[in-house]
């Protein structure tokens, strides 16, 4: 008998569980043959607090087949967690080095969905740097989906980190 599946979807910076990608993933998991459980937490804290919360979610579901899906900054977090827990991860236009985007990230930003204001500090960028995992210990755990026309993220950084694989 196979174990139940659990999917942890991590949205991007200033996004939400209400995003189109998150909602499509929820819909897919709910109607798939395996009827995977899915969790799409709202990521609204700094990096250290976010990782602490995500570790708790993973630890609660350890008896299940866990997979990660991360988009943008959620892809960065999924990379860290995949390496830490040796879990498969699908990354959608992942942020690869978000700590290098100091000028565009520092300061206050309005969430697209909730209108909540998020403040990004130097400490947050330093926390992101501490989460960097290179080189990857388990590169075969990743399936990376890239779009070349992303206005914010340079897909070439993801190709450099994860390699080019034709699937």
Question: Which functions belong to the PLM regions below?
Answer:
Residues 9-13, 69, 145-147:
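Short hydrophobic segments within beta-strands
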Residues 81-85:
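Aromatic pocket-lining residues of Rossmann-like dinucleotide-binding sites
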Residues 19-20, 77-80, 101, 154-156:
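Short glycine-/acidic-enriched loop or helix-start segments at secondary-structure transitions
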Residues 68-78:
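Gly/Ala-rich beta-loop-alpha elbow adjacent to hydrolase catalytic centers
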Residues 1-2, 136:
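Short, flexible hinge/linker loops that cap or flank conserved catalytic cores
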Residues 62-67:
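Short acidic/histidine-rich motifs immediately flanking catalytic phosphotransfer sites
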Residues 88-167:
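The alpha/beta-hydrolase serine catalytic core
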Residues 3-61:
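Active-site catalytic motif of lipid deacylating hydrolases and related acyltransferases
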């Amino acid at each position: 008998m196979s174990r139940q599946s659990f999917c942890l979807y991590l949205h991007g910076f200033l996004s939400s569980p209400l995003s189109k990608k998150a909602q499509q993933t929820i819909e897919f998991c709910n109607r798939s043959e395996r009827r995977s459980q899915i969790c799409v937490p709202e990521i609204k804290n700094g990096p250290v607090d976010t990782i602490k919360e995500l570790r708790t979610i993973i630890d609660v579901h350890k008896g299940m087949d866990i997979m990660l899906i991360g988009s943008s900054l959620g892809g960065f977090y999924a990379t860290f967690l995949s390496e830490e827990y040796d879990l498969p991860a699908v990354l959608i236009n992942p942020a690869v080095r978000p700590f290098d985007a100091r000028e565009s990230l520092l300061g206050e930003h309005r969430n697209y969905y909730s209108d909540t204001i998020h403040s990004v500090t130097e400490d947050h960028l330093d926390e992101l740097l501490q989460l960097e995992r290179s080189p990857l210990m388990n590169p075969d755990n990743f399936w990376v989906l890239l779009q070349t026309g992303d206005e914010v993220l340079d897909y070439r950084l993801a190709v450099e980190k994860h390699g080019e694989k034709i699937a």
